[in-house]
Structures are given as C-alpha cells and as structure tokens.
Swiss-Prot record:
It comes from Aeromonas hydrophila. Keywords: Acyltransferase, Cholesterol metabolism, Lipid metabolism, Signal, Steroid metabolism, Sterol metabolism, Transferase. It catalyses: a sterol + a 1,2-diacyl-sn-glycero-3-phosphocholine = a sterol ester + a 1-acyl-sn-glycero-3-phosphocholine. It comes from the Bacteria. The lineage of its organism: Bacteria, Pseudomonadati, Pseudomonadota, Gammaproteobacteria, Aeromonadales. This is Phosphatidylcholine-sterol acyltransferase. The active site is at S34, D306, H309. Belongs to the 'GDSL' lipolytic enzyme family.
Length: 335
C-alpha cells in the first residue's frame, strides 16, 4: 500500500486544477461484479449463466442495473464495462489451486482484460465497486481478509494510474448482513462486521489519497441503509425476502456430472469442473432450476430479486444518488 501512496503523491504536482473546478469526463470505465454486470458474464458463459429469462438480458436482476441507468442522467454517456458476475477483489487463483478460483475473474485480471483491448483516456471516470464476493460468496470474512481486499483495490487503482487513469471513484459496500443469502448461510453477524470494517478501510484509504485529487469515495452503503430504514419512501414493502427463489441456470448440475453434462459441452473439462465447484453456481445444485416463467413474477415492493441481487427498482434508486454525487464532483461532457 505504501508504494501506491508514494506513487500518487508523486503525481500531485502534475495534477494542477483550480480549487473550484470539476474534472471533466465523457466515459465511465467500470470494474466490479454482478451488481454492475450488463451482460459480460452471460456472454462469457455462452448464454448459460445467468439464464435469461428469468434474468433480464443477462443481468443479475429483473431489469437494467444501476450503471446503465446512469444514462438517464447523463445522455450520451459512454460506458466501458469490465464488471461481471462473480469476481473477487483478491486474485485467489494465485494463492490456491482450488478449481473454484480458476474460472471466476478478479479485479486485477479485469484491469488486464481492459488494457489488452483499450486504454485509459484523459476524460475517463474509472469506478471500482468490488469486494462483496470475497466476503459473502467465498467466506473470506475476517478483518485480515478485509485488509487483503483493501490492498487488492489499492494495488489495482495504482496500476490504473500508472496506465493513464486520471480520476478514480471507489464505491464502498452495503451491509452484507442484510442480504437474504447471509441469512440463509447464517453469517449475518460476520457479514455485517466485515462489510463495515471494509468500508472503514476504504474510507481511510480515500482520506490518505485525498491530497492527490485523483481518488474519491462514494458511500453507497448510506443509500442502502436509507432503503432499509424507510423502505416505503422507495416503494418497498419487503426488504428481507427474495422475489425469485430459483437458480441462476435452467438445468441444475453437480460436480460429479460436470465432465459429461451436455449443457456444459461448450466448455473444456477444466472449465466444467471449475464451474461446478464454484459458489456462484452452488445454488444450482440445491435449489430448483431456473424457470423461464419466473420472468413474469410480480416483484413490486421487493428489495431483492434473488438471494443476492437487488431488483431493478432498487438499482434505479441507487443510480440516482450515484449520478448526483458524480455530477457534484465531475463535469460531464458528452461526445
């Protein structure tokens, strides 16, 4: 973390702006997980996950997610989105041979994928929103684990700066203990604690880097907390139960059949085993298979679409304050 701090401080002299000016942006470059995925995982998994319908056009929700709804506030906004379902902040595949870490992405590799085909432009606003999968999907939920996640985020941001990124916006995490998945796993207390600790670490990081003028923090947890505290103000009546109780995929499968399952014929043997052993698909074994008819479910008043992901109504409610914050800190210039 020290090298990242020194690197950015070294760039302060090169980042001269008037005190009352807002840096301009015309494109958002997004790095994150399923909360921001607009179809990358669906494409990567050859239309297998998440099954659509019931999932909306490859999104992990029943409608558009917050990121794409930003275009309502910023007409003409260009988005380069590397976020996909399942990624962790930490590259666990580098420290473990467990197959479940070999197919799911991580933040550092998302950056690599972006740099292989694109580059950071002077008018890019880079957003990082990641970490929930480390804690909730994979169970790395101690304070030491949170420090490792923080370091992965800071290292990735440092790499972005070294590759030309000028403006970086960090998103913190909602209270993961309020997620239906945390309740079903009986990890409410641990999930709440680690997400709060994560947010404090991220706040401290943002404060340390404030002198650079390049890194800001959006505390999206406050919007989630407001929805839980006063759900009626957002048209919500149920903040605990998922609208949809099925799986991510139409046809459940288990590790023992992964090598022969015809549904996985498009993947090589290593990919099949990694997919079958991954927590992202764990509910595909134990839960009812995805149902196309579920796309017609009435989710009015529901905060959560499934055990992990919010409904599109909640995404809209998150998009509005995100847009307000972005507008207050940056100047949008449509191309």
């Amino acid at each position: 973390m020290k090298k990242w701090f020194v690197c950015l401080l070294g760039l302060v002299a090169l980042t001269v702006q008037a005190a009352d000016s807002r840096p301009a942006f015309s494109r958002i470059v997004m790095f994150g997980d399923s909360l921001s995925d607009t179809g990358k995982m669906y494409s990567k998994m050859r239309g297998y996950l998440p099954s659509s319908p019931p999932y909306y056009e490859g999104r992990f929700s029943n409608g558009p997610v917050w990121l794409e709804q930003l275009t309502n506030e910023f007409p003409g906004l260009t988005i380069a989105n590397e976020a996909e379902g399942g990624p962790t902040a930490v590259a666990y595949n580098k420290i473990s041979w467990n197959p479940k870490y070999q197919v799911i992405n991580n933040l550092d590799y998302e950056v690599t994928q972006f740099l292989q085909k694109d580059s950071f432009k002077p008018d890019d606003l880079v957003i990082l929103w990641v970490g929930a999968n480390d804690y909730l999907a994979y169970g790395w939920n101690t304070e030491q684990d949170a420090k490792r996640v923080r370091d992965a985020i800071s290292d990735a941001a440092n790499r972005m700066v070294l590759n030309g990124a000028k403006e970086i916006l960090l998103f913190n995490l909602p209270d993961l203990g309020q997620n239906p998945s945390a309740r079903s796993q009986k990890v409410v207390e641990a999930a709440s604690h680690v997400s709060a600790y994560h947010n404090q670490l991220l706040l401290n990081l943002a404060r340390q880097l404030a002198p650079t003028g390049m890194v800001k923090l959006f505390e999206i947890d406050k919007q989630f907390a407001e929805m839980l505290r006063d759900p009626q103000n957002f048209g919500l009546s149920d903040t605990e139960n998922a609208c949809y109780g099925g799986s991510y995929v139409w046809k459940p499968f288990a590790s023992r059949s992964a090598s022969t399952d015809s549904q996985l014929s498009a993947f090589n043997p290593q990919e099949r085993l990694a997919i079958a052993g991954n927590p992202l698909l764990a509910q595909a074994v134990a839960s009812p298979m995805a149902a196309r008819s579920a796309s017609t479910l009435n989710c009015e008043g529901k905060m959560f679409w499934d055990q992990v992901h919010p409904t599109t109504v909640v995404h809209a409610a998150l998009s509005e304050p995100a847009a307000t914050f972005i507008e207050s800190q940056y100047e949008f210039l449509a191309h």
